Amino acid sequence: MRARLVTEENKKWWTLAAVAFGLFMIMLDNTVVNVALPSIQRELDMQLSELEWVVSGYALTFAALMLIGGKLADAYGRRLVFVVGIAIFTLASLACGLASSGEALIAARVAQGVGAAMMNPATLSIIAVTFPPRQRGTAIGIWAGTSALALALGPLIGGLLTEHASWNWIFFVNVPIGVLGIAASFLLIDESRDESHERLDLPGLATSGLGLFALTYGLIEGNNFGWGSVRIVGAFVVAAVSLTVFVLLERRQRAPMLDLTLFRNRTYVGANLAMLLVALAMFGVFFFVSLYMQNVLGYSAVEAGAAFLPMTVLIILIAPLAGRASDRWGSRWLITGGMVLLAVQLAYFSQLSDDATFWVLLPALVLGGFGMSMTMTPSSAAAMRAVPVEKAGIGSAVLNACRQVGGSTGIALMGAIMASRLTSPPTTASFMDGFELALVVASVIALAGAITAAALIRPHDRSHGAEPVQQAAEAA
Protein backbone atom coordinates (compact mmCIF):
# COMPACT_ATOMS: atom_id res chain seq x y z
CA MET A 1 0.00 0.00 0.00
CA ARG A 2 2.82 2.38 0.88
CA ALA A 3 4.49 1.69 -2.49
CA ARG A 4 1.36 2.81 -4.33
CA LEU A 5 0.68 5.88 -2.23
CA VAL A 6 4.22 7.16 -1.70
CA THR A 7 6.37 7.85 -4.76
CA GLU A 8 9.59 9.79 -5.29
CA GLU A 9 7.53 12.61 -6.77
CA ASN A 10 5.11 12.99 -3.87
CA LYS A 11 7.17 11.74 -0.92
CA LYS A 12 8.10 15.23 0.22
CA TRP A 13 4.40 16.01 0.67
CA TRP A 14 3.92 12.84 2.71
CA THR A 15 6.90 13.94 4.81
CA LEU A 16 5.18 17.28 5.32
CA ALA A 17 1.99 15.48 6.36
CA ALA A 18 3.86 13.42 8.98
CA VAL A 19 5.60 16.51 10.33
CA ALA A 20 2.34 18.48 10.40
CA PHE A 21 0.66 15.62 12.29
CA GLY A 22 3.15 15.87 15.15
CA LEU A 23 3.20 19.66 15.03
CA PHE A 24 -0.58 19.84 15.36
CA MET A 25 -0.45 17.83 18.58
CA ILE A 26 2.14 19.99 20.33
CA MET A 27 0.68 23.31 19.21
CA LEU A 28 -2.82 22.20 20.20
CA ASP A 29 -1.60 21.88 23.78
CA ASN A 30 -0.80 25.60 23.89
CA THR A 31 -4.52 26.46 23.86
CA VAL A 32 -6.54 23.25 24.35
CA VAL A 33 -6.37 23.70 28.12
CA ASN A 34 -7.76 27.24 28.09
CA VAL A 35 -11.47 26.41 28.09
CA ALA A 36 -10.85 23.56 30.54
CA LEU A 37 -9.25 25.88 33.10
CA PRO A 38 -12.44 26.60 35.08
CA SER A 39 -13.06 22.83 35.40
CA ILE A 40 -9.44 22.18 36.35
CA GLN A 41 -9.57 25.03 38.87
CA ARG A 42 -12.68 23.62 40.54
CA GLU A 43 -11.57 19.98 40.60
CA LEU A 44 -7.96 20.56 41.71
CA ASP A 45 -8.70 23.66 43.85
CA MET A 46 -6.17 25.92 42.10
CA GLN A 47 -5.59 29.68 42.34
CA LEU A 48 -5.28 32.01 39.31
CA SER A 49 -1.48 32.06 39.52
CA GLU A 50 -1.43 28.24 39.57
CA LEU A 51 -3.66 28.17 36.49
CA GLU A 52 -1.18 30.45 34.76
CA TRP A 53 1.56 27.94 35.56
CA VAL A 54 -0.48 25.16 33.91
CA VAL A 55 -0.23 27.15 30.67
CA SER A 56 3.11 28.89 31.20
CA GLY A 57 4.90 25.83 32.57
CA TYR A 58 4.42 24.15 29.21
CA ALA A 59 5.21 27.24 27.13
CA LEU A 60 8.24 28.19 29.23
CA THR A 61 9.88 24.75 29.09
CA PHE A 62 9.04 24.60 25.40
CA ALA A 63 10.87 27.92 24.92
CA ALA A 64 13.81 27.30 27.25
CA LEU A 65 14.77 23.99 25.60
CA MET A 66 13.89 24.90 22.01
CA LEU A 67 17.40 25.97 21.05
CA ILE A 68 18.98 22.81 22.44
CA GLY A 69 16.29 20.83 20.61
CA GLY A 70 17.35 22.46 17.35
CA LYS A 71 20.99 21.63 18.05
CA LEU A 72 20.13 18.02 18.85
CA ALA A 73 18.12 17.72 15.63
CA ASP A 74 20.96 19.05 13.49
CA ALA A 75 23.65 16.99 15.25
CA TYR A 76 22.02 13.61 15.92
CA GLY A 77 19.34 13.36 13.26
CA ARG A 78 16.19 15.34 12.69
CA ARG A 79 13.89 12.32 12.46
CA LEU A 80 15.43 10.70 15.56
CA VAL A 81 14.98 13.79 17.72
CA PHE A 82 11.45 14.31 16.35
CA VAL A 83 10.45 10.74 17.26
CA VAL A 84 12.03 10.86 20.73
CA GLY A 85 10.19 14.13 21.31
CA ILE A 86 6.87 12.53 20.34
CA ALA A 87 7.51 9.67 22.78
CA ILE A 88 8.28 12.03 25.69
CA PHE A 89 5.29 14.21 24.86
CA THR A 90 2.96 11.20 24.68
CA LEU A 91 4.04 9.82 28.06
CA ALA A 92 3.79 13.27 29.64
CA SER A 93 0.27 13.65 28.23
CA LEU A 94 -0.71 10.44 29.97
CA ALA A 95 0.72 11.81 33.22
CA CYS A 96 -1.26 15.06 32.77
CA GLY A 97 -4.49 13.14 32.39
CA LEU A 98 -3.77 11.09 35.51
CA ALA A 99 -2.76 14.11 37.65
CA SER A 100 -4.72 14.39 40.91
CA SER A 101 -3.23 17.67 42.16
CA GLY A 102 -2.24 21.02 40.74
CA GLU A 103 1.44 20.35 41.44
CA ALA A 104 1.34 17.02 39.57
CA LEU A 105 -0.42 18.60 36.60
CA ILE A 106 2.10 21.45 36.39
CA ALA A 107 5.02 18.98 36.58
CA ALA A 108 3.54 16.86 33.80
CA ARG A 109 2.96 19.98 31.68
CA VAL A 110 6.65 20.83 32.11
CA ALA A 111 7.51 17.32 30.86
CA GLN A 112 5.24 17.90 27.86
CA GLY A 113 7.27 21.03 27.15
CA VAL A 114 10.47 18.95 27.03
CA GLY A 115 9.00 16.70 24.34
CA ALA A 116 7.59 19.63 22.39
CA ALA A 117 10.97 21.42 22.47
CA MET A 118 12.55 18.41 20.76
CA MET A 119 9.81 18.05 18.16
CA ASN A 120 9.15 21.60 17.06
CA PRO A 121 12.53 22.75 15.69
CA ALA A 122 12.93 19.40 13.96
CA THR A 123 9.71 20.00 12.00
CA LEU A 124 10.90 23.17 10.26
CA SER A 125 14.40 21.85 9.64
CA ILE A 126 12.96 18.67 8.08
CA ILE A 127 10.90 20.88 5.76
CA ALA A 128 13.95 23.02 4.94
CA VAL A 129 16.02 20.02 3.80
CA THR A 130 13.10 18.30 2.04
CA PHE A 131 11.70 21.10 -0.14
CA PRO A 132 13.52 23.21 -2.76
CA PRO A 133 13.36 27.00 -2.31
CA ARG A 134 10.61 27.48 -4.91
CA GLN A 135 8.25 25.24 -2.89
CA ARG A 136 9.47 26.03 0.58
CA GLY A 137 7.17 28.99 1.13
CA THR A 138 4.14 26.86 0.28
CA ALA A 139 5.35 24.06 2.57
CA ILE A 140 6.07 26.49 5.39
CA GLY A 141 2.66 28.05 4.76
CA ILE A 142 1.07 24.65 5.39
CA TRP A 143 3.33 24.20 8.43
CA ALA A 144 2.42 27.61 9.84
CA GLY A 145 -1.23 27.09 8.94
CA THR A 146 -1.18 23.80 10.84
CA SER A 147 0.35 25.57 13.83
CA ALA A 148 -2.16 28.41 13.73
CA LEU A 149 -5.03 25.99 13.13
CA ALA A 150 -4.05 23.94 16.18
CA LEU A 151 -3.89 27.09 18.29
CA ALA A 152 -7.32 28.14 17.05
CA LEU A 153 -8.95 24.69 17.28
CA GLY A 154 -7.62 24.15 20.80
CA PRO A 155 -10.51 25.94 22.55
CA LEU A 156 -13.17 24.02 20.56
CA ILE A 157 -11.56 20.60 21.06
CA GLY A 158 -10.91 21.39 24.71
CA GLY A 159 -14.52 22.46 25.19
CA LEU A 160 -15.96 19.34 23.57
CA LEU A 161 -13.75 16.98 25.56
CA THR A 162 -14.25 18.83 28.85
CA GLU A 163 -18.03 18.99 28.56
CA HIS A 164 -18.71 15.52 27.14
CA ALA A 165 -15.95 13.56 28.89
CA SER A 166 -13.73 15.39 31.41
CA TRP A 167 -10.77 17.77 31.36
CA ASN A 168 -8.46 14.74 31.68
CA TRP A 169 -9.31 13.74 28.12
CA ILE A 170 -7.74 16.84 26.60
CA PHE A 171 -4.49 15.07 27.51
CA PHE A 172 -5.47 11.41 27.08
CA VAL A 173 -6.38 12.07 23.44
CA ASN A 174 -2.70 12.71 22.70
CA VAL A 175 -1.71 9.13 23.52
CA PRO A 176 -3.08 7.36 20.40
CA ILE A 177 -2.12 10.37 18.27
CA GLY A 178 1.45 10.12 19.54
CA VAL A 179 1.69 6.40 18.77
CA LEU A 180 0.44 7.00 15.22
CA GLY A 181 2.86 9.91 14.85
CA ILE A 182 5.85 7.73 15.74
CA ALA A 183 4.82 5.09 13.20
CA ALA A 184 4.23 7.68 10.47
CA SER A 185 7.61 9.30 11.13
CA PHE A 186 9.54 6.07 10.63
CA LEU A 187 7.62 5.32 7.43
CA LEU A 188 7.58 8.74 5.79
CA ILE A 189 10.52 10.86 7.02
CA ASP A 190 14.09 10.32 5.81
CA GLU A 191 16.88 10.87 8.32
CA SER A 192 19.11 13.93 7.87
CA ARG A 193 21.71 15.70 10.00
CA ASP A 194 24.47 18.27 10.01
CA GLU A 195 27.73 16.29 9.93
CA SER A 196 29.78 18.87 11.85
CA HIS A 197 29.02 17.08 15.19
CA GLU A 198 29.36 20.19 17.34
CA ARG A 199 29.17 19.63 21.10
CA LEU A 200 26.19 20.80 23.10
CA ASP A 201 26.34 24.22 24.78
CA LEU A 202 25.37 23.32 28.35
CA PRO A 203 26.34 26.71 29.90
CA GLY A 204 24.12 28.41 27.33
CA LEU A 205 21.26 26.05 28.13
CA ALA A 206 21.61 26.65 31.88
CA THR A 207 21.80 30.46 31.73
CA SER A 208 18.98 30.89 29.18
CA GLY A 209 16.70 28.46 31.01
CA LEU A 210 17.33 30.12 34.38
CA GLY A 211 16.78 33.59 32.92
CA LEU A 212 13.48 32.71 31.24
CA PHE A 213 12.20 30.89 34.33
CA ALA A 214 13.10 33.78 36.65
CA LEU A 215 11.42 36.32 34.35
CA THR A 216 8.20 34.30 34.09
CA TYR A 217 8.20 33.56 37.83
CA GLY A 218 8.51 37.24 38.66
CA LEU A 219 5.66 38.23 36.36
CA ILE A 220 3.27 35.49 37.53
CA GLU A 221 3.99 35.70 41.28
CA GLY A 222 4.49 39.48 41.53
CA ASN A 223 0.98 40.18 42.78
CA ASN A 224 1.12 37.34 45.30
CA PHE A 225 4.36 38.40 47.00
CA GLY A 226 4.41 42.12 46.15
CA TRP A 227 6.29 43.76 43.29
CA GLY A 228 8.80 45.31 45.68
CA SER A 229 9.43 42.14 47.69
CA VAL A 230 12.90 40.63 47.89
CA ARG A 231 11.63 37.47 46.18
CA ILE A 232 10.23 39.24 43.11
CA VAL A 233 12.96 41.86 42.75
CA GLY A 234 15.46 39.03 43.13
CA ALA A 235 13.74 37.07 40.38
CA PHE A 236 14.03 39.98 37.96
CA VAL A 237 17.68 40.53 38.91
CA VAL A 238 18.42 36.84 38.33
CA ALA A 239 16.64 37.04 34.96
CA ALA A 240 18.62 40.09 33.86
CA VAL A 241 21.98 38.71 34.99
CA SER A 242 21.35 35.22 33.56
CA LEU A 243 20.23 36.46 30.15
CA THR A 244 23.15 38.92 29.98
CA VAL A 245 25.61 36.15 30.84
CA PHE A 246 23.90 33.95 28.22
CA VAL A 247 24.54 36.50 25.46
CA LEU A 248 28.15 37.01 26.57
CA LEU A 249 28.76 33.26 26.65
CA GLU A 250 27.25 32.76 23.21
CA ARG A 251 29.59 35.38 21.76
CA ARG A 252 32.60 33.40 23.01
CA GLN A 253 31.52 29.79 22.51
CA ARG A 254 33.07 27.83 19.64
CA ALA A 255 29.79 25.96 19.18
CA PRO A 256 27.11 28.22 20.74
CA MET A 257 23.56 27.09 21.37
CA LEU A 258 22.41 30.36 19.81
CA ASP A 259 24.37 31.26 16.68
CA LEU A 260 24.47 35.04 16.96
CA THR A 261 25.64 35.36 13.35
CA LEU A 262 22.06 34.59 12.31
CA PHE A 263 21.10 38.01 13.63
CA ARG A 264 23.31 39.78 11.11
CA ASN A 265 20.43 39.31 8.68
CA ARG A 266 17.90 42.00 9.48
CA THR A 267 15.05 40.08 7.83
CA TYR A 268 15.72 37.18 10.20
CA VAL A 269 15.74 39.58 13.15
CA GLY A 270 12.51 41.22 11.99
CA ALA A 271 10.73 37.89 11.44
CA ASN A 272 11.70 36.64 14.90
CA LEU A 273 10.68 39.87 16.60
CA ALA A 274 7.35 39.77 14.78
CA MET A 275 6.78 36.18 15.96
CA LEU A 276 7.71 37.10 19.54
CA LEU A 277 5.40 40.13 19.60
CA VAL A 278 2.40 38.37 18.05
CA ALA A 279 2.73 35.60 20.64
CA LEU A 280 3.23 38.15 23.43
CA ALA A 281 0.01 39.87 22.38
CA MET A 282 -2.14 36.85 21.47
CA PHE A 283 -1.38 33.94 23.84
CA GLY A 284 -2.59 35.87 26.86
CA VAL A 285 -5.71 36.82 24.90
CA PHE A 286 -6.60 33.17 24.22
CA PHE A 287 -6.16 32.51 27.95
CA PHE A 288 -8.25 35.40 29.28
CA VAL A 289 -10.90 35.58 26.53
CA SER A 290 -11.71 31.94 27.34
CA LEU A 291 -12.13 32.87 31.01
CA TYR A 292 -14.20 35.92 30.01
CA MET A 293 -16.56 33.83 27.88
CA GLN A 294 -17.18 31.27 30.63
CA ASN A 295 -16.93 33.24 33.86
CA VAL A 296 -18.51 36.51 32.66
CA LEU A 297 -20.74 35.66 29.69
CA GLY A 298 -21.77 32.29 31.12
CA TYR A 299 -20.72 30.19 28.12
CA SER A 300 -20.29 26.47 28.56
CA ALA A 301 -16.91 24.95 27.66
CA VAL A 302 -18.26 23.84 24.27
CA GLU A 303 -19.84 27.23 23.56
CA ALA A 304 -16.60 29.01 24.43
CA GLY A 305 -14.65 26.71 22.13
CA ALA A 306 -17.18 27.04 19.31
CA ALA A 307 -17.04 30.83 19.54
CA PHE A 308 -13.50 30.67 18.15
CA LEU A 309 -14.65 28.81 15.00
CA PRO A 310 -14.82 31.89 12.73
CA MET A 311 -11.16 32.55 13.45
CA THR A 312 -10.36 28.87 12.95
CA VAL A 313 -12.06 28.66 9.55
CA LEU A 314 -10.32 31.79 8.31
CA ILE A 315 -6.93 30.44 9.41
CA ILE A 316 -7.58 27.20 7.50
CA LEU A 317 -8.41 29.15 4.35
CA ILE A 318 -5.93 31.99 4.52
CA ALA A 319 -2.69 30.61 6.01
CA PRO A 320 -1.70 28.57 2.90
CA LEU A 321 -2.57 31.53 0.66
CA ALA A 322 -0.40 33.77 2.83
CA GLY A 323 2.49 31.33 2.33
CA ARG A 324 2.12 31.51 -1.46
CA ALA A 325 1.81 35.29 -1.36
CA SER A 326 4.97 35.43 0.73
CA ASP A 327 6.82 33.37 -1.90
CA ARG A 328 5.72 35.73 -4.63
CA TRP A 329 5.86 39.17 -3.03
CA GLY A 330 7.85 38.76 0.16
CA SER A 331 6.68 38.89 3.76
CA ARG A 332 7.19 42.50 4.83
CA TRP A 333 3.79 44.03 4.15
CA LEU A 334 1.85 40.84 4.86
CA ILE A 335 3.28 40.74 8.39
CA THR A 336 2.83 44.48 8.88
CA GLY A 337 -0.79 44.35 7.73
CA GLY A 338 -1.51 41.28 9.85
CA MET A 339 -0.15 42.91 12.99
CA VAL A 340 -2.23 46.04 12.36
CA LEU A 341 -5.34 43.85 12.09
CA LEU A 342 -4.45 42.15 15.37
CA ALA A 343 -3.95 45.52 17.05
CA VAL A 344 -7.43 46.58 15.91
CA GLN A 345 -8.89 43.25 17.08
CA LEU A 346 -7.38 43.62 20.54
CA ALA A 347 -8.51 47.23 20.88
CA TYR A 348 -12.03 46.10 19.93
CA PHE A 349 -11.92 43.27 22.50
CA SER A 350 -10.91 45.77 25.19
CA GLN A 351 -14.24 47.58 24.77
CA LEU A 352 -16.44 44.51 25.33
CA SER A 353 -19.07 44.66 28.05
CA ASP A 354 -20.06 42.01 30.57
CA ASP A 355 -23.20 41.16 28.55
CA ALA A 356 -21.80 41.03 24.99
CA THR A 357 -23.50 38.70 22.50
CA PHE A 358 -21.68 36.45 20.06
CA TRP A 359 -22.48 38.87 17.23
CA VAL A 360 -20.61 41.56 19.10
CA LEU A 361 -17.61 39.23 19.44
CA LEU A 362 -17.70 38.14 15.77
CA PRO A 363 -15.92 41.14 14.14
CA ALA A 364 -12.95 40.73 16.46
CA LEU A 365 -12.76 36.99 15.77
CA VAL A 366 -12.80 37.63 12.02
CA LEU A 367 -10.02 40.20 12.34
CA GLY A 368 -8.05 37.69 14.39
CA GLY A 369 -8.35 35.02 11.70
CA PHE A 370 -6.97 37.34 9.03
CA GLY A 371 -4.33 38.81 11.34
CA MET A 372 -2.96 35.50 12.66
CA SER A 373 -2.72 34.00 9.16
CA MET A 374 -1.03 37.05 7.67
CA THR A 375 1.47 37.25 10.52
CA MET A 376 2.50 33.73 11.54
CA THR A 377 2.87 32.13 8.10
CA PRO A 378 4.91 34.91 6.43
CA SER A 379 7.05 35.34 9.58
CA SER A 380 7.99 31.66 9.48
CA ALA A 381 8.65 31.75 5.75
CA ALA A 382 10.79 34.91 5.96
CA ALA A 383 12.89 33.53 8.82
CA MET A 384 13.57 30.18 7.14
CA ARG A 385 14.44 31.81 3.82
CA ALA A 386 17.06 33.88 5.63
CA VAL A 387 19.11 30.92 6.96
CA PRO A 388 21.27 28.38 5.08
CA VAL A 389 20.16 24.76 5.18
CA GLU A 390 22.92 23.62 7.58
CA LYS A 391 21.52 26.10 10.12
CA ALA A 392 17.89 25.09 9.55
CA GLY A 393 17.53 23.35 12.90
CA ILE A 394 18.85 26.18 15.04
CA GLY A 395 17.23 28.77 12.76
CA SER A 396 13.79 27.24 13.27
CA ALA A 397 14.49 26.68 16.97
CA VAL A 398 15.15 30.39 17.49
CA LEU A 399 11.95 31.26 15.64
CA ASN A 400 9.84 28.88 17.69
CA ALA A 401 11.60 29.87 20.91
CA CYS A 402 10.59 33.46 20.18
CA ARG A 403 6.98 32.35 19.84
CA GLN A 404 7.03 30.33 23.07
CA VAL A 405 8.94 32.99 25.03
CA GLY A 406 6.43 35.54 23.79
CA GLY A 407 3.56 33.24 24.72
CA SER A 408 4.71 32.43 28.25
CA THR A 409 5.71 36.03 28.92
CA GLY A 410 2.45 37.30 27.43
CA ILE A 411 0.33 35.11 29.69
CA ALA A 412 2.39 36.18 32.70
CA LEU A 413 2.21 39.86 31.74
CA MET A 414 -1.53 39.84 31.05
CA GLY A 415 -2.06 37.85 34.23
CA ALA A 416 -0.10 40.40 36.25
CA ILE A 417 -2.21 43.22 34.80
CA MET A 418 -5.42 41.31 35.50
CA ALA A 419 -4.38 40.40 39.04
CA SER A 420 -3.51 44.03 39.81
CA ARG A 421 -7.15 44.99 39.21
CA LEU A 422 -8.94 41.97 40.74
CA THR A 423 -10.60 42.44 44.11
CA SER A 424 -10.74 39.78 46.81
CA PRO A 425 -13.03 38.00 46.34
CA PRO A 426 -13.00 38.63 42.56
CA THR A 427 -16.00 40.45 41.09
CA THR A 428 -17.20 40.79 37.51
CA ALA A 429 -16.49 44.52 37.60
CA SER A 430 -12.88 44.04 38.73
CA PHE A 431 -12.36 41.26 36.15
CA MET A 432 -13.62 43.53 33.36
CA ASP A 433 -11.41 46.37 34.58
CA GLY A 434 -8.30 44.18 34.37
CA PHE A 435 -9.48 42.59 31.12
CA GLU A 436 -9.79 45.99 29.43
CA LEU A 437 -6.36 47.18 30.53
CA ALA A 438 -4.66 43.91 29.56
CA LEU A 439 -6.13 44.02 26.05
CA VAL A 440 -5.17 47.65 25.53
CA VAL A 441 -1.58 46.72 26.41
CA ALA A 442 -1.78 43.74 24.02
CA SER A 443 -3.03 46.04 21.25
CA VAL A 444 -0.06 48.37 21.73
CA ILE A 445 2.29 45.37 21.58
CA ALA A 446 0.74 44.23 18.27
CA LEU A 447 1.12 47.73 16.85
CA ALA A 448 4.78 47.69 17.88
CA GLY A 449 5.10 44.42 15.97
CA ALA A 450 3.74 46.06 12.82
CA ILE A 451 6.27 48.88 13.09
CA THR A 452 9.08 46.39 13.70
CA ALA A 453 8.18 44.29 10.65
CA ALA A 454 7.94 47.33 8.38
CA ALA A 455 11.30 48.64 9.59
CA LEU A 456 13.39 45.45 9.57
CA ILE A 457 12.09 42.94 7.02
CA ARG A 458 13.45 43.57 3.54
CA PRO A 459 10.84 44.23 0.83
CA HIS A 460 12.10 41.29 -1.25
CA ASP A 461 13.01 38.85 1.50
CA ARG A 462 11.96 35.95 -0.69
CA SER A 463 15.41 35.92 -2.31
CA HIS A 464 17.44 35.87 0.90
CA GLY A 465 18.90 32.57 1.97
CA ALA A 466 17.64 30.81 -1.17
CA GLU A 467 21.01 30.21 -2.77
CA PRO A 468 22.66 28.15 0.00
CA VAL A 469 19.50 26.15 0.56
CA GLN A 470 19.06 25.59 -3.16
CA GLN A 471 22.63 24.31 -3.49
CA ALA A 472 22.19 21.94 -0.57
CA ALA A 473 18.89 20.66 -1.94
CA GLU A 474 20.44 20.01 -5.34
CA ALA A 475 23.44 18.28 -3.77
CA ALA A 476 21.10 15.98 -1.85
Regions found by a protein language model. Name each.
Residues 12-61, 166, 203, 217, ...:
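Transmembrane core module of solute transporters
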Residues 1-11, 194, 456-476:
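Intrinsic disorder in cytosolic terminal tails and internal cytosolic loops
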Residues 71-204, 230-231, 305, 321, ...:
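Helix-loop-helix hairpins in multi-pass membrane proteins, especially solute transporters
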Residues 5-6, 182-209, 251-266, 327, ...:
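Flexible interhelical linker loops that connect adjacent transmembrane helices
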